[in-house]
Amino acid sequence: MIQFEHVTKSYEKATILKDLNFTIPDGQFVILIGPSGCGKTTTMKLINRLLEPDSGIISINGQDIRLQDKVELRRHIGYVIQQIGLFPNMTVAQNISVVPKLLKYDKTRCAKIVQEMLKLVHMEDY
């Protein structure tokens, strides 16, 4: 579960997020939609601590992310960016397996994850 409690973030004199509150339950897929400059990217960067909030608390599974190691936190969070973030010289399956391999999962577990992800988007037969 990801939770934002009274989160505010400003850049110089512009407040981008003001008193933001929301909860994303485990297993929930979320899409942030809005015009340029409304805070979508800022929100995502706050979740993985590429940015720090000016105030408020962001927690994952009840733990304040400020208390977590940034690198370890990022290893367990994934999101899809607007621009293409794939390796063009790799297959879809190879792209999917990048993170599990970085986490040092064995080949069997990597293959299982790849198949689960392909099935999720109805591409398991490709």
Sequence positions of predicted segments:
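Short coil-to-helix segment of the ABC ATPase nucleotide-binding domain corresponding to the Q-loop/switch region
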Residues: 90-97
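Conserved ABC ATPase "signature" region
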Residues: 97, 101, 108-126
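ABC ATPase nucleotide-binding domain signature
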Residues: 81-85, 90
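The feature captures the beta-strand-to-loop junction immediately N-terminal to the Walker
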Residues: 33-35
